[in-house]
Amino acid sequence: SHAGQPAFPGGKIDPEDYALSRQQGVPVGRIAALREAVEETGLDPAGVEILGELPTLPLAVSDFRVTPVLGWWASPTRVGVVDTNESALIARVPVRDLLNPANRHTAYVKRGRITHKTPAFEVVHSGSDARVEFTVWGFTAIVLDKIFDALTWTVPWDASVLKPAPASV
């Protein structure tokens, strides 16, 4: 668990995901990713087109290995917090805001004698209930950074700007 950190929906592969994967001829990671998105946001999976998977990445703090599954939300539907034990906010952030160099810096957190640094994105969510400003950092920011680099969308930003990672959202 990475409480307080902005993150994409996700979690472990459940045993029933394997059966669905075999039935549908779809990779198990994709089945699990859609199931988690439904469980955590109420997303209608029929409106999502799976584009592919990124290479598996280590999650250093918890020693998990994560395979990000990328999807295009082709037919957006209403989403929201389904379980407050899992999520506090479902935020929709425009990609242009994530790419804006003014919204980027390097976040760091010290654990003992080790300092961990990750890319970070300052973002604003303006929902029907409130305007919320927060920092996307850690694993989620690393994934976003890798996606933008792979797509050659990254706009040069000053990675030497260091800010402490927030304690929570």
Question: Which residues does each predicted region cover?
Answer:
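Unchanged
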Residues: 13-136, 145-146, 150-169
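N-terminal strand-loop-strand
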Residues: 1-19
